[in-house]
Structures are given as C-alpha cells and as structure tokens.
Amino acid sequence: MGLGDYSHCRQRMSRGLYGVSGRAALWSPVFHPVHRMPCGTWRIGIEVPEHVRASSPVLEHLRRQLERAFQRAAARGRARRAREAVAAVAAAAAAAREERSRTRMECALARLRAELLELRFQNHQLARTLLDLNMKMQQLKKRQDQELASKPQSPQDKEMNSECGSA
C-alpha cells in the first residue's frame, strides 16, 4: 500500500470533520498501533493548547489527581518490591542459620557416636580382662586344692582350711 491509497482520508481532513469547517483542528485520526497509519476512526487529540488547559480547571485538577495516583502506585510498587527483597534476604539468612545449626548438630552427634563406640570398646576390653582374671583365679584355686589334697594334713591344718573355706 502506498501513500496514494489514503488520498480519500486527506480530502476528508482538508474539508473538516464530515463537512463541518473549523472543527478539524481539534480532532486527529487514531493510528493503527503496528503500521502507524490512520484507521478511519477519530478522537480528540492529546496535544491540547495551554489556553484550553487553563480554561478547564476541573480537567487540570483531575490530571493532577491521576498523576499523584500514578506516583503513589509506583511508590507502593517500589516499596512492595523492597519488602519482598528484604523478606527474601531474611528467608535466605534464616535458611543459612538453619543449615549451620543442622550441621553443628550432626557434628555433635558424630562426636557422641564416636565416643560411644570408644566406650563400648573399653567395656568389651574390661569384660575380657575380668573373664581372664576370673579364669586365672579358678585355675589358682584348683591348683591350691590339688596341692592341699596331695599333702598329708594334720588335724590342725584341716581345722584351719575348714575355717578359711567357711569364712
């Protein structure tokens, strides 16, 4: 499509809006967003002269209110994003603290397990030593009983042995 295809639009704009002279300056065509060409619909232009703005204080007041509302909305958005960032940092710090705490507890548990294994090993060694001593005592007692049985004993020795054995 060339520029010549829109000659009918130029003719309509030159004679005014639908033949009404003097009003064409306040109206501008709506442009298609992709091609930036007039689409055939009309609306009031955005560029309003200063004397028109001053003549409508209500519109100026509304414009200022909208401007302030947009500024407040933008500030709230920035504040919300800042709060979310702070919350994310706090959550990350809490997760890091939790991880350090969990690591410390795991280390403490590992030390306690190692100590428990050491104590079990020592307990096993002490039990074996006690069994060895008990067996030696039994062997010594048997040997002593054999020696006493092989010796002739006097009546006094028998009384002594019976007293020691009963005591």
UniProtKB/Swiss-Prot annotation:
GO biological process entries: response to testosterone
Annotated S-S bridges: none
InterPro entries xref list: FAM167_domain (IPR051771)
Tissue-wise expression: Preferentially expressed in testis both in embryo and adult. Expressed at much lower level in other tissues.
Superkingdom per UniProt: Eukaryota
Stretches for region Disordered: 140-167
Classification via PANTHER family: ALANINE AND ARGININE-RICH DOMAIN-CONTAINING PROTEIN (PTHR32289:SF2), PROTEIN FAM167A (PTHR32289)
Protein name per UniProt: Alanine- and arginine-rich domain-containing protein
Gene name for this UniProt entry: Aard
